[in-house]
Amino acid sequence: MSAVTFEDSGTPLKKSKNRHGETSEEMLRRMCRDIAKDITDAKQQDYIDQPRKEITASEWMEGVYDIRYIVDREKRYYRAELMVAGGGPTIWVNLNSKEVEGYWGSDRVTVPFTDNLGLDEYCEEMYGC
């Protein structure tokens, strides 16, 4: 029988891999990188066998599960956080820090992006409606 290795927090070290040979942290990192790349490049790939195509902020927002608006004390728009995955990994696009933030169990990943889609402006406009 093999010995169990533990993280600093005392939880067992996760070494199990998915069918692609990735650990949950590696899979979370890949997912966050892909989302950051889509926002930075203003392109998205619908299916693996198709090329990436240019998209608008409105098209990209169709895949958002939830929006948390950050407002000042007078309820004026400041920034937003967009939930793009949940249930297994939870992934938020933070328009304040300009980072894709992924959480899955004890794993946490952040990947920076440049908002070339204009998501912040889109959210500000939607908040004002």
Where do the protein language model's features map onto the residues?
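Generic alpha-helix signal with a bias toward terminal, lower-confidence helices
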Residues: 40, 47, 51, 94-96, ...
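Polybasic, proline/glycine-rich intrinsically disordered low-complexity segments
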Residues: 98-129
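Compositionally biased, intrinsically disordered low-complexity regions
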Residues: 12, 23, 65, 90, ...
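Acidic, low-complexity, intrinsically disordered interaction modules
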Residues: 74-109
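Detector for Asparagine
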Residues: 18, 94-96, 116
